[in-house]
From Swiss-Prot:
Keywords: Isopeptide bond, Phosphoprotein, Ubl conjugation
Gene designation per UniProt: Bcl7a
Name this protein carries in UniProt: B-cell CLL/lymphoma 7 protein family member A
Low complexity composition bias: residue spans: 151-165
Record InterPro entries: BCL7
Amino acid sequence: MSGRSVRAETRSRAKDDIKRVMAAIEKVRKWEKKWVTVGDTSLRIYKWVPVTEPKVDDKNKNKKKGKDEKCGSEVTTPENSSSPGMMDMHDDNSNQSSIADASPIKQENSSNSSPAPETNPPVPSDGTEAKADEAQADGKEHPGAEDASEEQNSQSSMENSVNSSEKAERQPSAESGLAAETSAVSQDLEGVPPSKKMKLEASQQNSEEM
């Protein structure tokens, strides 16, 4: 029997506590957060204040409550005093949760919107990279082309040098040949009459002019 009586007492106490809490919540539902000056000082505090109603009696009650709050002594039960703090905590938590819920949505939207412009520009860059890769591949596939061009340049330079040396050799040889011919002609002219000498000299002059 003692166990049942204890249970009944706890149930009745719980019901009373629930009623008190519900009454405190109903009172606090109509409160607002406002900036309130503290007494005669210029300090202002942002805290919960009961909503003013048009009725005269309620206005007087609210004025009394406002004076008590300005003095720093709130005429409320511990449950009522704790309930505004709980409401503040709930509001702050709800605001933070709403911000936290909104921030991932914004991040998702930004992540969804950001890849769209990034997909378009890589097309030309891929083309240029492909061209560069093709050029490198061509250079790797045909390494002998550059070597062949270098060999051709070296051969052409060698041919030019050989031609110039041959020309230089031919000029003194031609001069020596002309000198030998003139000496031979002069030797022949010694035993030839003067008329033939004149003809030979004229022919030599013509050959030299040519």
